[in-house]
Structure formats: structure tokens, C-alpha cells
Amino acid sequence: MPGVTGAPVLTASTAEEALEAHRRSLLGLCYRMLGSPFEAEDAVQETMLRAWRSVERFDGRSELGTWLHRIATNVCLDMLKGRRRRAVPMDLGPAQAPVAENLHTRSEATWVLPIPGALVAGEDPADSVVAEESIRLAFVAALQHLPPRQRAALILCEVLSWQAAEVAELLDTTVASVNSALQRARATLQSRGLRRESAAARARLPDLQMLRRYVDAFQRYDLDALTKLIHADATQSMPPYDMWLAGRDDVLAWWFGPGIGCRGSRVLPVGTANGSPAFGQYKPSPGGFEPWALQVIEVEDSLVRQFTFFLDTERVFPLFGLPPRLDA
């Protein structure tokens, strides 16, 4: 992100609007660094506070966005000191059998949490495609395996298109060190089987007809219809439980076994989470339907390849604008 000399100097009267114009980009950076939309929002607030305190010292020798991203990166690095990394259940052990005895919870701080695509989408459609690709759950989870400074270097260079020299200045290191960090970071992501798809490929969200068929089949809990919509190698996870399932047969064995209480659920589309279709799921309860999970599905060849059910509805549903209850 090259700097531009001669940018307008900020004053207290012009700063607030100028700072807010960069909020989405800052939130995207902080989310990729931290793996939680709630921590990312805290980091953005701290970034704005630090920027506001020093706004009259901003002399316009670099772009305002560059200056803010430097502050935000340092805020995230401070927040990551001494923290354990966030993960997805697949990081923590092998797939398990679809039986209730395998359900074990871990704390909220363990998990990569979802973020609405609308919160980080840019105004330019091309920028939005890049943003959605780089907040995929698999990508964000893989980033958490990188040491914080490697993580920052990769995000700044490969997602935000900074030059290595700019990152070196921010991290107080050399260009050679940044390039070495990038090489190690890429190797780590590759070792974790992360596929870097083209922007054009990621832009092709599942067609609406396929999503409608899925919603209809799920709400009817129709085994035959669901079988036709789920990939043979599908996976399922349900944070905060660390159990995950591998294969369509085990997924459906769970749904029609221990998960049979989801029969009769209502499902509300909420756009995208992490670049993938997302739905609010409500289970039947006396007099209506109560929140159960935010479903995030990844689709491959018109079949659902991955299900993630985020069960912390008390926090996640408000984030996605979902109502606290549905009437019968």
C-alpha cells in the first residue's frame, strides 16, 4: 500500500469522518489477525482511540489508511502476546464417531468465530471478492498457525498488497527478514493443505436454486433430498464442541440420531459468513422456535462440502442481525 506524500493534514474537526472511512478495512485486518469478530472490533476501537490521540501529529507524509493499518497491526500484535491460538475442531484431533458421548466443549477463546461478509466487504466488487476469499474459515484458521509477526507480514503483503519495505518499517526489521517470513508463512499454509483459489472461482457463490433446495430439504428433514445435496466427503463441526465428523454417512447419522432434535427447524438466510452462505437455525420450542446455530456451509460442485454450526447464538445471532426467537 504505497504512501502518498502531500496527503491532507487532519484536524480534530475533520478526523472522525476520515478515520471512520477506513473502519471496514481495519476490521478485516484485525479479524484475520485475531480470528474473532468481537476481538477484532475491540482492536479497531483501540486503533481509533490511539489514532485520535495522535491525530494532530499526523503530517500527511503517508496515506491515512497506511498510518491506520500500522496502528491496527501493532494493536493486534499487542493483543496476541501470550495468547493461545484460535482453531477449528479439525485442528485439534481426528474425526470421531457420530455419537453423543464424543461431545466435549472447550472455551470460546479456543475457536475461530464467524464474521458477516458485509462487515468487511469493500465498495468495489473486485475488492469484495478478495476480501471474502481472505476471510474464509479455512484461511483464517490456517493464519492462526503462524507466529504473529509472520501472520502480519502475510496479511499485509498478500491480502492488502503492501510492499515488503513498508512491512519491514512497520515491524522494525529488514526487507530480507520480511521476505523470509513470507516464505515460511506460505510453506506453513501449504503444509496445512490450504488451496489458494482464484478470485474468479471464489466469486461464484452457489446458485440460489441450490440453496433453496437445501433450505427446503433441511426444514423438511428429508433424508433422501439431503443425501442428494451433501458431498460424499462432507465434514461437520459444531463449536464449542471439539467433535467433528467426516463423510456424508456420519453427518446424516448424527442428524438422524443424536441430532434428531433439529427435525422441524426453521432456517433463515443471512447472506454470507466468511465468504460462504450462512443461515440462522431455530429449533422447535413451545410456542415457536428458539435459536440453535449459525450454519455456515461451503459448497463444491453444487454439493455441500462442509457444515459448521456455531452454537454460541447469544453472541453470534445479534452479530448477523438474527431475531432472538421465531413465533410459531
Model-derived regions: residue spans:
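A short, charge-rich alpha-helical start-of-domain segment used by transcription regulators
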Residues: 2-28, 38-41, 52
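Acidic, proline/glycine-rich intrinsically disordered inter-domain spacer in sigma factors
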Residues: 2-5, 10, 97-137, 200-205
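Short amphipathic helical patch at the helix-1/turn junction of helix-turn-helix
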Residues: 20, 31, 157-159
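C-terminal and inter-domain tail/linker signature
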Residues: 24, 49, 91-95, 123-126, ...
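Hydrophobic-face residues of short alpha-helical interaction/recognition segments
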Residues: 26, 30, 68, 72-80
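Short loop-to-helix capping motifs
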Residues: 35-37, 61, 221-222, 232
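Sigma70-family region 2
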Residues: 36, 46-64, 78-87, 144, ...
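Arg/Lys-rich amphipathic alpha helix in sigma70-family domain 2
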Residues: 73-91, 98-105, 191
